Amino acid sequence: DEARARARRERAAKATSSSDERATRAAIEACRLRAISHLCMDFERVAGPHLGKRWCSAFEEWLASASEDEPLVPAGDGGGDALAKKLRAKKLRAKKDASDEAVDAVVRVMMLKATECARVMRNEFRGPATSVSKEERADGVVSLRVGKTEVRLNGDHFEKLKTLYANASSKEFVENDFLFDAFAMVCRYDAAAGGQFRFSGGSQASLHGQVFDVLRDCFKVECELFASPLNCRWPMYYSKYGDVDKPFGSLGDFRACKPSGGAFEANPPFDEDVVARMAEHLFECLDAASSALTFVVVTPHWPNRPCWEKMRRSKFCSRAEVISVREHGYYEGAQHRKKSRYRLATSDTSVLFLQNESAVESNPVTDEKISLLREAFRAKRDAKK
């Protein structure tokens, strides 16, 4: 009896500890979302005039350069280098002053703002959240609130998260635990999309469901390397933010994927540095594979850019297709909270098939399969720019 009582106390203590961790994570992510929202306002004011209409994309890419120790807060040296690179490239394309002085002035201000963002996050944190509330609205939107921070998502995405959460754990489903974890995860992705000042979500845009169906039926693909709990097509996926994504089944960062065989889809953020790192990892996997291995890589059509050319010219590239900007579309990056899920493409897209010799034989890329893939890529009628 004493042993059973002790075991019950230990289980209760562990459950309490786990609940505290969830409540703490939710509070931290709420602070992060508010701080990033203010940082986004500063970025538009300071860097926006130098980056033009697509400054939102540059902001997302800058946030993504942050270290894993403090996600989305690019206060370290890497953040300054990443922003300087973006500014210099934009100014050169626009034939404007790309001198070190012109770029450094913007970078200096924004790095001070990023440091302030990190400080505000630390100062606002007051310990674990005491509660999380859910409201189901008449328009089908579900809102989750912790303190003064609210996030929203469409009802179908909320139900999808429930299913992923239940499937990812062998434990009994606990509604309050789920709500804390869902709130924290949605906060992180809302912050990554620019915060609540200006939602963008370009770096999280995903393929239409019909494209995934063709990849599965024709090329045996059943796992994504760059997904999220909000946009994943299948239960098996890798994602950037393992700390908040794991409760929903994420297998971790794409670099954790080291398969001996199989078929995978890779639609990385459209950032040259990320694509270059991904390419090196995929080459290593293909070299080491002991059986048929295929990666279907979707990126912008980037001829003359080293990261793309390296994949296109690789010994593993069995086929490269280019889909015209007028002939396809995507799901919105912030589809979980937008009325229309569809968006038009903004550039030509390439689909590269990277395969080892065994995969070329057992999983061939044929004209018939490519025709089905192109049809699946077509933009939807209600797609927006």
Positions of PLM-derived features:
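Class I S-adenosyl-L-methionine
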Residues: 1-266, 270-385
